[in-house]
């Protein structure tokens, strides 16, 4: 965990505003350690600029508060973990980051379950399964 921390994966402005305790349960810490080590840190090393986590882990209450689906990988369902990331420099910079991630996937440098361009590069969703096959799906929503 060179560039990201578990604390970043737990932080949520929505949780803070609504008084929701959003701590990763001990049984799911490994999911986020693996997401950081195998996906986020390699992305950050390639991008060479700061990357910010908008949403990492979500407890059930937080997931409901943000309108997340019941099967959201942010909740560690099916041995997974997810993070919504951004450059904080706008859509064009996020688009560049998205294509860097896409290239890392296509060249076999990282595996992800899903890479999603959300809302025309407002943010980027990346997810990873710690057990089972990562699908390397590249999508736009």
Per-range role (PLM):
Residues 1-46, 135-141:
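Extracytoplasmic cell-surface/polysaccharide-interacting catalytic and binding patches
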Residues 8, 13-15, 61, 66, ...:
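Solvent-exposed, flexible loop/coil residues
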Residues 35, 39, 62, 81, ...:
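Amphipathic alpha-helical interface surfaces
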Residues 37-68:
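Extended, low-complexity, intrinsically disordered C-terminal regulatory tails
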Residues 46-48, 78-82:
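Short connector loops at helix/strand junctions that flank enzyme active sites
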Residues 51, 83, 124:
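A broad, low-specificity signal marking well-ordered, structured residues that form hydrophobic/aromatic
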Residues 73-79, 87-141:
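Catalytic cores and adjacent binding grooves of peptidoglycan-active enzymes
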